[in-house]
From Swiss-Prot:
Membrane-spanning residues: none
Subunit structure: Homooligomer. Both monomeric and oligomeric forms interact with RNA. Interacts with protein M. Interacts with NSP3; this interaction serves to tether the genome to the newly translated replicase-transcriptase complex at a very early stage of infection. Interacts with host RSAD2; this interaction inhibits viral replication.
Protein name: Nucleoprotein
Location of this chain's protein in the cell: Virion; Host endoplasmic reticulum-Golgi intermediate compartment; Host Golgi apparatus
Biased composition (Low complexity): 143-215
Molecular function GO terms recorded: RNA binding
Family designation: Belongs to the alphacoronavirus nucleocapsid protein family.
Taxonomic source organism: Porcine epidemic diarrhea virus (strain CV777) (PEDV)
Chain positions covered by the region annotation Dimerization: 277-379
Post-translational note: ADP-ribosylated. The ADP-ribosylation is retained in the virion during infection.
Domain CoV N NTD, chain residue ranges per copy: 14-136
Length: 441
């Protein structure tokens, strides 16, 4: 016996998700803004907290042009929905896989939603990002079906009523005919038929007249509406008049920019703190705040930086390359030794960290050249062959005394960095001792 089979046309009805969809308010895809464990917690046990978000591409036609709209993302549990036959994390366009820790990668059999059911608002174990919103569900289509059934019911009642009236009239007419003689009944029937025919003709004429009037009115309204639409688009108008109408608008917009008060650049957005109010280990030497102003003069254990570095601080050329070899906070805390000594009203904290840098590193020579650079710089200046009198020599000795480790104000906290540039094998061993202490005692 022959059988009939139909091939798949390529369009299928997508199963409905149990939950209301998500929508991203910016241009990023959902996988870039949503965590990979964002599974709704409304249904299923801990083994079934696994599934995928399926993209529904949206657009709108405006004046014959397709305008893209933000996509809706619908959630389906693993083994359900339009991609129910895919294994977990199978790379598929428009699919974002999510799962909670401990979930099994097996079909959940939690099913999908019926068309008459309302979508569930999804709940999550963590707060959604600010750029992700839940699309509120619309009224289910069941209400429209109910309204159609009611309208059909009313139509059936209306169609039934004429038949009932006809039955009643016929029975009443039969009883009257039986009560009167046959001749008189026949004449009455003929007269009634003539009256009915006249009434039906009058009604049909009235309908035709009203239709003619309505057709003219609707045609005029349509022509007027088309004319208004063309005028709004600038079609059929005098182009010079259209330009004159646009000129005042442009002048208005240009003048509005002139009257807008401009920002006063001299106003400071935030009040800058004085250097003395900032702890020494948080100061950044730049601009007017030189290295000497932030950390004191070079000398003793403060032995890093030449004249340019001391003057410009972090703005000096080569600082970024050297800073790449300085340890970060985590390295100081977890990779070195931290010693704490209690003082009268403070703590003295010493950080001791050692690191090995290959000689092949292009920045290590630049760092080594800055160690004790202020001493080397003074020596180079002394090579100049110039005659100096005794008075200038005495002044120079006094100036060099600035670099000695003299006493600092008692309320200043110091940071000590020592660089041991001893060569060990093929690498340069750099030892960093970072001491923060109070000299008040």
């Amino acid at each position: 016996m022959a059988s009939v089979s139909f091939q798949d046309r390529g369009r299928k009805r997508v199963p409905l998700s149990l939950y209301a969809p998500l929508r991203v308010t910016n241009d990023k895809p959902l996988s870039k803004v949503l965590a990979n464990n964002a599974v709704p917690t409304n249904k299923g046990n801990k083994d079934q907290q696994i599934g995928y978000w399926n993209e529904q591409i949206r657009w709108r036609m405006r004046r014959g042009e397709r305008i893209e709209q933000p996509s809706n993302w619908h959630f389906y549990y693993l083994g359900t929905g339009p991609h129910g036959d895919l294994r977990y994390r199978t790379r598929t366009e428009g699919v974002f896989w999510v799962a909670k820790e401990g979930a099994k990668t097996e079909p959940t059999n939690l099913g999908v939603r019926k068309a008459s059911e309302k979508p569930i608002i999804p709940k999550f174990s963590q707060q959604l990002p600010s750029v992700v919103e839940i699309v509120e569900p619309n009224t289910p289509p069941a209400s429209r079906a109910n309204s159609r059934s009611r309208s059909r019911g009313n139509g059936n009642n209306r169609s039934r009523s004429p038949s009932n009236n006809r039955g009643n009239n016929q029975s009443r007419g039969n009883s009257q005919n039986r009560g009167n003689n046959q001749g008189r009944g026949a004449s009455q029937n003929r007269g009634g038929n003539n009256n009915n025919n006249n009434k039906s003709r009058n009604q049909s004429n009235n309908r035709n007249q009203s239709n003619d009037r309505g057709g003219v009115t609707s045609r005029d309204d349509l022509v007027a509406a088309v004319k208004d639409a063309l005028k709004s688009l600038g079609i059929g108008e005098n182009p010079d008049r259209h330009k004159q109408q646009q000129k005042p608008k442009q002048e208005k917009s240009d003048n509005s920019g002139k009257n807008t008060p401009k920002k006063n650049k001299s106003r400071a957005t935030s009040k800058e703190r004085d250097l003395k109010d900032i702890p020494e280990w948080r100061r950044i030497p730049k601009g007017e705040n030189s290295v000497a102003a932030c950390f004191g003069p070079r000398g003793g254990f403060k032995n890093f930086g030449d004249a340019e570095f001391v003057e410009k601080g972090v703005d000096a050329s080569g600082y970024a390359q050297i800073a790449s070899l300085a340890p970060n906070v985590a390295a100081l805390l977890f990779g070195g030794n931290v010693a704490v000594r209690e003082l009268a009203d403070s703590y003295e904290i010493t950080y001791n960290y050692k690191m090995t840098v290959p000689k092949s590193d292009p920045n290590v020579e630049l760092l080594v050249s800055q160690v004790d650079a202020f001493k080397t710089g003074n020596a180079k200046l002394q090579r100049k062959k110039e005659k100096k009198n005794k008075r200038e020599t005495t002044l120079q000795q006094h100036e060099e005394a600035i670099y000695d480790d003299v006493g600092a104000p008692s309320d200043v906290t110091h940071a000590n960095l020592e660089w041991d540039t001893a060569v060990d094998g093929g690498d340069t061993a750099v030892e960093i001792i970072n001491e923060i202490f109070d000299t008040g005692n």
